A protein has these predicted regions:
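A short, structured beta-strand/loop element
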Residues: 31-48
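N-terminal first-folded block
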Residues: 2-34
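Residues within mature, well-folded domains
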Residues: 28, 49, 85-88
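Ordered, soluble secondary-structure elements with a strong preference for glycine-centered loop motifs
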Residues: 2, 53-57
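Conserved interaction-surface patches within small, structured recognition/assembly domains
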Residues: 43-53, 76, 81
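C-terminal structural segments of small proteins and small subunits
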Residues: 57, 61-92
Length: 92
């Protein structure tokens, strides 16, 4: 697990996730302009009751706001899938 992955996990703990998966996709983007600047590419799948009653856009904003201080320096690109526990049960 990378240091940035650990930082993402620590920050997202504020959302009290029931489940969180963080995938470092940076190696797939080697040579990409963002990779040269040090920011990595990450995918996050997060399940939290804090997403209940929120639109997909509001959920993404909540995740991005939580990770704001990591954006650009540590994170160049971020893919987010945010679910409530009930939605997660239906998917998995």
């Amino acid at each position: 697990m990378s240091d940035t992955t650990d930082l993402i996990r620590q920050k997202l703990a504020a959302l009290e996730p029931a489940k969180i998966d963080i995938i470092d996709d940076s190696a797939r983007h080697a040579g990409h302009a963002g990779a040269r600047g040090g920011g990595g590419h990450y995918s996050v799948i997060i399940v939290s009751s804090q997403f209940s009653g929120k639109t997909a856009l509001a959920r993404h904003r909540l995740v991005y706001d939580t990770l704001r201080e990591l954006m650009h320096k540590h994170i160049h690109a971020l893919s987010v899938k945010a679910y409530t526990p009930e939605e997660s049960d239906l998917i998995h």
